[in-house]
Regions:
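N-terminal intrinsically disordered, cationic/polar leader segments
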Residues: 2-91
């Protein structure tokens, strides 16, 4: 039997809310790595990683027909995107 609109909305809320909360929690954990007393990082490489994350958010929003734009220093994140940024960050 096909689901009603109300059932689909309830299922979306049940599935999406914990996933969104989990994603937000992961961003907080990434932020915990900003303590310079405990960690050292390359600012240029880190910027590439954040662009990678922003593009993932843009792509996710696009799946919901939501147009999201981010800029970093006047440059659109899509123009800064490098697919291998995370692998390069680790090297």
């Amino acid at each position: 039997m096909a689901q009603t609109t109300a059932e689909k909305k309830a299922r979306f809320a049940r599935v999406a809310v914990p996933r969104i909360e989990s994603a937000v929690d992961l961003f907080r954990k990434i932020g915990n790595c900003s303590a310079k007393s405990n960690y050292e990082w390359d600012q240029f490489k880190l910027k590439k990683v954040f662009v990678h994350l922003l593009v993932a958010i843009q792509e996710c929003a696009a799946q919901f027909d939501i147009d999201v734009h981010f800029t970093i220093g006047q440059i659109d994140s899509k123009d800064l995107y490098e697919p291998n940024a995370i692998k390069e960050f680790l090297s």
